Amino acid sequence: MTDDAAPSTRKIIHVDMDAFYASVEQRDNPELRGKPVAVGGSAARGVVAAASYEARAFGVRSALPSVTAKRRCPDLIFVPPRFDTYRAVSVQIREIYAEHTDLIEPLSLDEAYLDVTDNKQGIPVATEIATIIRARIKEVTGLNASAGISYCKFLAKMASDLNKPNGQAVISPKNGPGFVEALAVKKFHGVGPATAAKMERLGILTGADLRSKSLAWLQEYFGKSGAWYYNISRGIDNRAVQPDRPRKSVGAEDTFMVDIVDLDAARAEITPLAAKVWRHCEAKGLHGRTVTLKVKYADFQIITRSRTTSAPISWLDDLEAAAQSLLEPLFPAPKGIRLLGVTLSSFIDDEETTADQLELQI
């Protein structure tokens, strides 16, 4: 079932800290300011967890292998992550959000949705609230934040990218559908490279192209996601802002443009997936014991393999090694692999972990 109309009464803000981890490092170490900085490990198997804007100018980004990052930017400075510090700053930012609303949905340490429709300060204009929040974040933490304001989460998220860094933008109910129609589908939040490529093969390049398709057509080609694309192409997203809920698992997966047939290629794909899962778990202070590998073959058959450890996984290398050990017995592959996924679950409470388990080595 789809929605007939987008509610225009809600006021949603998406706040996104600018190059958060790297900016914290530049804030705390003046020698790093104005220089290309990558948070992560510089070792051969290291992965970039975050990059400063100076580094991004060279094509350095999160989840990029450190060797590749250094090749793109020879002057790149690697800094080991300090997740305890990032979490402490995130708490400060969350307290600023709470001055205005209790409807806070964190997506990670550095971004969150806020529903300020009925806010604590009684401020009727959401753009004013966003301006106040960004100024308070700068005052309290010394860091810059960008914000997007709209009537739904999807458009607030898209708006927060429009004037980065250190800016904000609004997409009104009047302009929402037109904004989506003009937007390239490959820029839609939630549409990955493989889905964008599929849409383009079907002649869907923009939101307007997507809107021209019927619900039945979209469901035929995109399954359960068809209804989502149908609504989003019309600027409709009625998802509520939901405060934090306990996570049962954290996973990452990737669909490949060309099916994978050999083990080395599959191993290379596991590395960034494990890094993405680890980065999110470290940011949330989650410590898990069960690693699950998901494999989707070219004929869409899906298999999973899991392994549970006696103690919580303490390092990124251990997570990746566990995933790789689950992968290797599947080769030689009986058919091409279309998708790989890595998930960490069986989380334990923070108080059960030791201090050294909060340190990340990449």
Task: Identify what each model region corresponds to.
Residues 1-221, 226-227, 344, 348-352, ...:
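Gly/Gly-Pro- and Ser/Thr-rich, intrinsically disordered tail segments characteristic of DNA damage-repair
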